[in-house]
């Protein structure tokens, strides 16, 4: 039975009692729990701005530890080279983090969430670019789905939308660069702890010159091991104690920078003249171009501003960046350049050499803490991004532990933490110096910048509907700038740049494999859905018994009867008294309000069977409830649906009988009588037990498939599926209530 709404006939009392699901008009609007607009009061914004200092800026704030040594690995050839490089770093900080991210990209958030997947989800709401065809009309009624169709006046946006939806190549390209960006962030996550901790610990050689670099490495390794070991406790346990530490760090580096500027050479301020950048390139040619790979390290961690937006708001990040981060690091870089003008031989360890002697130990301790916090922020960002990829079927199933009751984005992924931890320790031992790690570091950073630029261009065309000259200027300026940096970094590919690149490609290949088979499996089920007449014949068989209890059969399909159902009935010729085809569906939005979670439909014949379809909708940051809580909520909403269905049936009967709407109290009374028995039956069957049914699909490449497809499906995907988390564990389904049905899909 399908239920449809007739707004004109429904009385106010009926409207009040209806649940707003897929069969009743627009969903009830609820307010988003995070404000990212202008409505935030300034006291709250200032508080968030302070907190963001500790969470967002750890990485970019610790870059002064190693930027000059990475930019001048062979020493300073000419005193004015320092002015040119300083000018280059200042304008890089202004152009990419400040102009691009702080004042443009942050506004392309997905209901307050940022990052590569947030951009992809934002685009996918305005154009059907997702590979799995599980869109439903009612999804647009969810409160924070909030799409605005391109207006007829702006034909360009309609044209872009049409091209994206009609081109498989465009869909694949968008998805590919999205997972590449995610993979690059993961590659960045392996290098940030290594270079940050190693550069901070290296300062100890100033007071203990007898220590070798290898000994410094072995001091750094235990710190890294402790860092990765405590991830399971979550950042919330020490959370916003980060802000005071990083604030002290910024005060120290700004003060020391101002001191060096005043004591050594105040004229270094002429670096604000961009002509010194041109002079630097004229004087050094190819060497200047190669040095870009070191200079770009001054903006590592910039993507974290966007990825961590969900914890703060736009104004808070704009305030903390322009008033705290930029002045502090700019003063630090200017002070270091002023110091190096007098002592160019100290470029290999600029940060610690430029410290006033009495401040060495306090700064050393704070530097170690800041390096750990920088690593922590990068790891938290990597976990958060992957947790968004999981619900969209873009990453193999792994355990996601929510470490904070207050901040939903704070998660921990044990398998990924172990992988990054091993890689980070191995990189530290293998590369040993910050200069060597710096060669490998930049490639991930700049490629993520470039990917964001391309996705932002699509957002401007499709969603913001910005004028073409502005879009062209944005694309040309940032693509050209990022290409210059990327080309320089790639020149160091053989010196270490290959490492994060290969790591990212392997991770990307695993994500692509998982998603490819996931999509193919969905299409197979969609192509083999059970026709209604076959469903009726199946339930009418004499050997099919009606057994007590509630059965939940999990399926990815949001429409139709999955092919595993006939298999189940053949093996166990019985159907539960209350049977629900259960689909867990993730929408391309961060959150779905609990009131809008479920949509129901009655399916199959009524005779002796109560069979329903239920789609439970989640955002990509919504945690799944435990099995017990989920089942209780589901059955509660099912009883509400049964009641609303009865209300609607009575209302339709009243209208069909010429009552013209009739007495609302009479309608409700008849509805209550119709629904009471069915609600009692649902309660009774729930008391008798709940059984979870799942199809254990063995996916194989169809006969005649190419060798590559056989390898991807039969070996890579199968090995991933068997060695990673099982689906019932991801759903927290108790084993003693689980029944699996084996089935083979040839795709």
UniProtKB/Swiss-Prot annotation:
Role: High-affinity potassium transporter.
The name this protein goes by in its record: Potassium transporter 20
Q: Which GO terms describe its cellular component?
A: membrane
Q: On the Cytoplasmic side, which residues? A: 1-47, 106-171, 231-237, 310-318, 375-410, 464-469, 518-747
Q: Where in the cell is it found?
A: Membrane
- The reply on keyword Protein transport is no
Any one Gene Ontology BP term: potassium ion transport
Extract the Pfam families matched here: K_trans, K_trans_C
Any one Gene Ontology MF annotation carried by this entry is: potassium ion transmembrane transporter activity
Stretches assigned to the Extracellular side: 69-84, 193-209, 259-288, 340-353, 432-442, 491-496
Look up and give the membrane topology term.
Multi-pass membrane protein
Q: Which family does it belong to?
A: Belongs to the HAK/KUP transporter (TC 2.A.72.3) family.
